[in-house]
């Protein structure tokens, strides 16, 4: 997913096929985190990787055009790609229908999986080790074969970044590898015996916070990666992105935060309990200010992503005598209480789309409701009617996908390239999502640009909600709000300042799919940013009489 880092013109790329995933080793059974087959040695560096030249292995894929007989279908393994096509130049409707029929046949071979699915996003300041930690998880859970890992090691050495071997698994484009900074939201999958996971590796640099918001908007759990190294922790907290990421995660609606105190094996730290306590004490104060409840919302885990320590397997005896808690993956496996609105209206914000052989595929997280193969749905806001051909996860398929699943959906019925845009949502035909350009909202002001310190009517910035990004202008201020009692204090104020909460009317540059907070919180939360900082966050409380009447009319129809 290519994203423009400039907030003023930030637009996800919706036309290119996604990059081919790294070859993955077939995984028959994934061990429990506490009994994983990979046991990290108590050393700050991973075991050396064999780099002698051998034939490179690649993941097996199956071309739709190669499926001719029932035997071809039977030979498809669950870990193979669902389908692969060579071009997207098909214009003939009959040929598109033929491809769609073959896709339907292929996905019938794949198993359904009843394990809970969690979307996790890696957050934190630049160079905290987010991509390295993500990559080490992929290796430890068997998603990267040795030949591919050896290839990444060679490439890291060629770029004089020997310590970035695991990061190369997630940072796939040349800019990320040469600069050593994540730009896009990396995406990968792994599993344990308890759960299935989608990894969203977000950028840490302040220029790419809009990209981070796209990743965090899909997540159930945030993993805030903290460098324990002397100077790096302080840089991330004092003027860095550590606290902003934690604040944004709370605003966007992430339920849990797991704080991974990374680089504990670093020579300036050496598993120091005093350093760990210093970090956790300071962060707890900041996280509470961001709205996180220390008793139930966040957990601390010490470890090392590069050293693969306390990531999958718990710490081996002798590594750290003061920590006996679960590993990072063990902590994730133990999380419970995810709220899933299965009975609600279908809502799937589209994060990516691409076209194969005339079939449009979209990727997104099911926020509410359910979606089934064969179902007719709308792409909003344009009300394009499409049919669902298939629903697939990384190694499983679904007849019906439920809230929390991050899936690829093959669709039939799209004509033209303007049906899908940033902010598009899949919705039920008889339960449409509101499309509005003016809203009433409660806004909490966090910061203001240096050149304009007051929040007043006519103030303009950038509006982020789910995958939508639009210009926004303050139309009017209705009343200031007491945040403790939620009561209105002053009617029609002329201005507001940092720290205030205000009920106001906002006008968007283009109509966006939004809902009221009482109906669907995930489609009601938003943030307001300028080019480099988060100005405010808020929630939609009223979509307006006209929008409500239109929804009522469409529902009856």
Swiss-Prot record:
Residue ranges of the region described as G4: 262-265
UniProt-recorded Gene Ontology molecular function terms: GTP binding; GTPase activity; translation release factor activity
Residues reported to bind GTP: 124-131, 201-205, 262-265
GO cellular component: translation release factor complex
Signal peptide: none
Domain of life assignment: Eukaryota
The tr-type G domain, residue ranges: 115-342
Region (Disordered): 40-71
Region (G5): 304-306
Region (G2): 180-184
Matching PROSITE patterns: G_TR_1, G_TR_2
Cited Pfam families: GTP-eEF1A_C, GTP_EFTU, GTP_EFTU_D2
Keyword GTP-binding recorded: yes
SUPFAM superfamilies in alphabetical order: EF-Tu/eEF-1alpha/eIF2-gamma C-terminal domain, P-loop containing nucleoside triphosphate hydrolases, Translation proteins
Cellular localisation: Cytoplasm
UniProt keyword annotations, A-Z: Cytoplasm, GTP-binding, Nucleotide-binding
Sites annotated Interacts with GTP/GDP: 273, 407
One BP annotation, GO: cellular response to stress
Chain spans, region G1: 124-131
Chain positions covered by the region annotation G3: 201-204
InterPro entries the UniProt entry points to: EFTu-like_2 (IPR004161), G_TR_CS (IPR031157), GTP-eEF1A_C (IPR054696), P-loop_NTPase (IPR027417), T_Tr_GTP-bd_dom (IPR000795), TRAFAC_GTPase_members (IPR050100), Transl_B-barrel_sf (IPR009000), Transl_elong_EF1A/Init_IF2_C (IPR009001)
Function: Involved in translation termination. Stimulates the activity of erf1. Binds guanine nucleotides.
Family: Belongs to the TRAFAC class translation factor GTPase superfamily. Classic translation factor GTPase family. ERF3 subfamily.
Protein name per its UniProtKB record: Eukaryotic peptide chain release factor GTP-binding subunit
